[in-house]
């Protein structure tokens, strides 16, 4: 069995200013997305320029942070939000929802489309290959924070989280790092390397992420304040991923 290494959540400090690994992972994700987008524009000679790319990353960053935090409080910790609304601003403590962030990015992309006259699916197809490595960075942030641990297990690589209990658990953050991050990146990046019908890359991302999340969540301990939210075995993350999967299937079929 393995033991969680109990990593200091603070990466470094400048006097009273403390930089947390969790926030640093988000910064790495946004910078990585810009670099990947820049490479795709140059390599594939896409009808994008650097100003558009920078604006898109900026809009998306706002959507991810605002939508992710609001989504977490609404989907996962609504009672805490009602009684202590100021916790909404404590992002460094963790607590971000991918699905809330996705809704935030959808709004940001709509505003971007209005500004630059691009279609929504064109923007979606451009963004999709840039996202998974950012998701990977976010899951590393979850692991460093020692949050979102897995269910009890007896597999040889089970990890004991001393701040939780003495039971070996699935390191589910690392599963999600591998599935939603690395595997999904390889899938989307390779698929998007050739010209595709508009909307196909977006559809593949929606389906791919939903499937990866549905699998990974089956090893993750449900949030203590929620437990299982449907049929006695579905978590909130799985419930929110099902519409993604259905929309992805519909879009894939519509763009066949």
Curated annotation (Swiss-Prot):
The keyword NADP does not apply. InterPro entries: Lgt. GO terms for molecular function: phosphatidylglycerol-prolipoprotein diacylglyceryl transferase activity. It is found in: Cell inner membrane. Its EC number is 2.5.1.145. It is a multi-pass membrane protein. It is an enzyme of class 2 (transferase). GO terms for cellular component: plasma membrane. The keyword Transmembrane helix applies. Keywords: Cell inner membrane, Cell membrane, Membrane, Transferase, Transmembrane, Transmembrane helix. HAMAP family: Lgt. Catalyzes the transfer of the diacylglyceryl group from phosphatidylglycerol to the sulfhydryl group of the N-terminal cysteine of a prolipoprotein, the first step in the formation of mature lipoproteins. Belongs to the Lgt family. This is Phosphatidylglycerol--prolipoprotein diacylglyceryl transferase. It comes from Legionella pneumophila (strain Corby). The lineage of its organism: Bacteria, Pseudomonadati, Pseudomonadota, Gammaproteobacteria, Legionellales. The gene is lgt.
């Amino acid at each position: 069995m393995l033991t969680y290494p109990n990593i200091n959540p603070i990466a470094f400090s400048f006097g009273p200013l403390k930089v947390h690994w969790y926030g640093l992972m988000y910064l790495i994700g946004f910078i990585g997305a810009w670099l990947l987008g820049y490479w795709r524009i140059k390599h594939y000679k896409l009808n994008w320029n650097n100003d558009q790319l920078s604006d898109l990353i900026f809009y998306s960053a706002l959507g991810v942070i605002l939508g992710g935090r609001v989504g977490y409080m609404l989907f996962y910790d609504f009672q805490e939000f009602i009684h202590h609304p100021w916790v909404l601003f404590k992002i460094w403590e963790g607590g971000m929802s991918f699905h809330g962030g996705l809704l935030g990015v959808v709004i940001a992309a709509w505003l971007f489309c209005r500004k630059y006259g691009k279609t929504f699916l064109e923007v979606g197809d451009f963004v999709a290959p840039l996202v998974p490595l950012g998701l990977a960075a976010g899951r590393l942030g979850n692991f460093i924070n020692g949050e979102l641990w897995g269910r009890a297990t007896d597999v040889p690589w089970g990890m004991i989280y001393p701040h939780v209990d003495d039971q070996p658990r699935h390191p589910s953050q690392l599963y999600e790092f591998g599935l939603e991050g690395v595997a999904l990146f390889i899938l989307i990046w390779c698929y998007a390397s050739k010209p595709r019908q508009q909307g196909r890359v977006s559809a593949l991302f929606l389906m791919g992420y939903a499937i990866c999340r549905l699998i990974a969540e089956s090893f993750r301990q449900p949030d203590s304040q929620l437990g299982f939210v449907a049929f006695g075995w579905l978590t909130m993350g799985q419930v929110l991923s099902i519409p993604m999967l259905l929309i992805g299937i519909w879009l894939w079929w519509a763009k066949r």
